[in-house]
Each structure stands twice: as structure tokens, then as C-alpha cells.
A protein has these predicted regions:
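Contiguous, well-ordered alpha-helical segments that form the cores/surfaces of helical PPI scaffolds
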Residues: 134-142, 156
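An N-terminal alpha-helical hairpin/helix-loop-helix interaction module that forms a charged
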Residues: 1-128, 144-264
């Protein structure tokens, strides 16, 4: 089973992946701790608060090519835009009672407003705009036990490997609910793996302060590491294409329906 093979690699390479002088994947939990410690939407000095909250994100968001946090900081350099940024985050972080469609709508609104404003100060920039995965990460920072970090390549590769029976799409067709459902399935599988739970609880004790994400960052870490550290390329793990995966899922559903009908 592909999932067990991935879990085996995650366990056997855990020390290497979390080596502070090496890959240091534990920084994801430190970034969350830092955000939780400093975030205050009503802070008098919003700019300093925002910088303090986001300072440990490392390459989770900004890298040499794209800098969405840099885009927000560009706006925060303009004294007359600070309240605009604050209100965008306030709207994004509204309670939604678990309504993922409403949440996805707020993601789009945040992107549209922010990007239109960023364009006023950095016209045509490809470096600063907010993308879907960035905004999902902002949500994960604020409500880590209610969201999952998302990166398209890693997520699609994972779905193909485990033959996830649904298509969360991409771009305009993306479905937050379907992506989160896939993550929920991984969450329930990994929480039954005693070895990973043991390794993770030691890491969590070391790296995390002031929050309980209910293993949601761990779920993303497994999806991310499987892609980044080539868990799929040892020849044992067979991956399918998204198209083939969805087709197989539909056939499975039809067989199940027939079996139910025949059993009646």
C-alpha cells in the first residue's frame, strides 16, 4: 500500500528531515508559534505586529522568486494603507462555522482586494501578488486546527499517489472542501500510526508553543516531504495521473452502487 510505504520513509528519514543544521522541517511549527504569540488584529502598531508575527516563516511563503509577504509589507510602508490591510485580514479571519464555500469566497475577495491595491504601488509585478496557496496559509496560521497548508504541486502528486477519489481541481476550479477532505483522510490514517505519533510528539514539544493544531501541520509536512525528498521515486510507489485516478474512483463508486443494489 502506497501510504504505508510513504509512512515508512517519513519515519526512517525523520531525524534527517528535522536536523536543525540540515533540512530543519520543524520550522513550520516555529513559524506557527511565532504567529500565535504576536498576532493581534487590533494592535495599535499594526505594522510592527505584522512583522513580528510573520518573521519566522522562512521559505513557506517568500522566496527569491515570489514575495507575497513582501507585497503586504509594501502596502504597510504606505501610512494610508495600513488600515486597509488590517481590514482585509479582519474579513479573511471572520468566523464561518466550518462553511468551506464561504471561506473559499473570502479567500478570493482577499486576493482581489489586495492584488488590486498592490498593483497601484508595483504595477505589473509578478513578485508581490497574493495567490490562493498564500491566503490558505494565512488562514492556517490563524486557525491551524481548522485549515491545512496547501501547495498545488505537492497536493496533486499526493492525490495521484494515494489515488484520492476526488478532484480538488486547480486555479478557477479549485475546491477547498475537496482538498481538506483529502487531508482529513490522511489525518485519520497518520493518527493511527504510533511510530509517527511518537516522533511527532517529541518534535511538537520542542518546536511548538501556545497552540494545538490537532496534527494539521503534520499532515501538510508529510505531503510536502513526500514530494520534496522524493519519496515517490524509489520505483516501489506507483503514481497515477489525475485523470486516471478520477476515472478509477468513478468506477469504484459505480461498483459499490451495484453491489448495494444487488444486496437489496
Amino acid at each position: 500500500h502506497n501510504l504505508n510505504l510513504i509512512f515508512e520513509q517519513y519515519i526512517s528519514r525523520f531525524a534527517e528531515l528535522n536536523d536543525l543544521d540540515g533540512n530543519d522541517e520543524g520550522y513550520k511549527w516555529r513559524a506557527e508559534s511565532c504567529f500565535v504569540e504576536h498576532w493581534d488584529i487590533d494592535a495599535e502598531d499594526f505594522v510592527s505586529m505584522f512583522k513580528a508575527s510573520t518573521k519566522e516563516m522562512s521559505n513557506l511563503i517568500d522566496n527569491a522568486t515570489v514575495q507575497p509577504i513582501g507585497g503586504i509589507l509594501l502596502l504597510l510602508k504606505q501610512p494610508n494603507e495600513v488600515e486597509f490591510v488590517r481590514e482585509c485580514f479582519r474579513e479573511l479571519y471572520e468566523e464561518d462555522g466550518g462553511d468551506l464555500e464561504a471561506r473559499q469566497d473570502r479567500i478570493y475577495v482577499f486576493m482581489e482586494k489586495m492584488n488590486a491595491k498592490i498593483d497601484q504601488y508595483a504595477s505589473g509585478s509578478w513578485k508581490y501578488p497574493q495567490k490562493m496557496n498564500n491566503v490558505i496559509y494565512y488562514l492556517s496560521l490563524r486557525y491551524p486546527n481548522d485549515n491545512y497548508i496547501f501547495k498545488a504541486t505537492e497536493a496533486t502528486e499526493w492525490a495521484n499517489c494515494i489515488e484520492y477519489g476526488d478532484d480538488f481541481g486547480s486555479g478557477e476550479t479549485f475546491s477547498l472542501a475537496k482538498y481538506y477532505r483529502m487531508c482529513d483522510e490522511l489525518l485519520s490514517a497518520v493518527s493511527e500510526n504510533d511510530e509517527i505519533m511518537e516522533l511527532h510528539s517529541r518534535r511538537f514539544e520542542k518546536e511548538a508553543r501556545g497552540f494545538d493544531d490537532e496534527l494539521h501541520i503534520l499532515v501538510y509536512d508529510i505531503i510536502y516531504c513526500a514530494h520534496t525528498y522524493h519519496f515517490y521515486t524509489d520505483g516501489i510507489i506507483q503514481t497515477t495521473s489525475a485523470k486516471e485516478r478520477i476515472k478509477r474512483a468513478q468506477i469504484r463508486d459505480e461498483i459499490e452502487k451495484l453491489e448495494i443494489e444487488l444486496a437489496v
